[in-house]
Amino acid sequence: QTCALPISIAINSYYTRAKELSAIGLTVEARKEIQQLEKSIRKNLTGVLWLSNIYHKAGGYSESLKLLQLYKDFATKSGERTLSPRFWKYFFPLAYREAVTSNSKYRKVDPFFVNGIIRQESLFDSKALSPAGARGLMQIMPATGKKLYPKTKLKKPFEADVLFQPDLNIRLGVKYVSQLNKRFGGNGTHILISYNAGPHVLKKWLKRFGHLNDLDVFIESIPYPETRRYVKHVLRNRGIYNTLYSPS
């Protein structure tokens, strides 16, 4: 069911303009109007859920997720224990679905694993830029992108900012995941450690903790707190995507 449109939004000029701009395909301009609308209703649960849906339709996935997190926080504080499947599908969207699906199929990589990485890396913000310089949806470092880029057979020379292009970023990111997948025999934990901290770091940790057969114990033994959290969150994301979208 569609979340009812609050009257305060229906008569809001920002909403009217956003709807008109979205209808003619001007999604970037529509999102700017929505951002102005957000300021006036961000603490209204019904409005937040409704607005996150509009962000989603306009391609504003990261904005939608931030609003949904706000909704989730308010719902928890107000004693709401369960959230609808509709909420969770917006909270874990199949954003950039065609690019993720086609590249994952070609590289024989689990698309839910890729979705889990993108959600954790950038919250589906194609313009995301880390302090270290990682760019785009899958937060690819320029040095890594430059190594992967020749395999695309694109004629234009590589520039770091091409990593902000969603389709190309996913193409290169999935290629890199595929390389790690082959290198580490499909071990998701090892792939994620390598993706986050580097293969050389994984090699060092395997010498120290490789004897630990229990996966949870091994993950808890990861020395870098950031990498430990990253691995847990991406594996959780992958599990939720599988639960929400797997045909079985």
Tell where the protein language model's regions lie, with residue ranges.
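Primarily a LysM-type cell-wall glycan-binding module
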Residues: I11
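Catalytic glycan-binding domains that act on GlcNAc-containing polysaccharides
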Residues: Q1-S8, R17, I24, E29-R31, ...
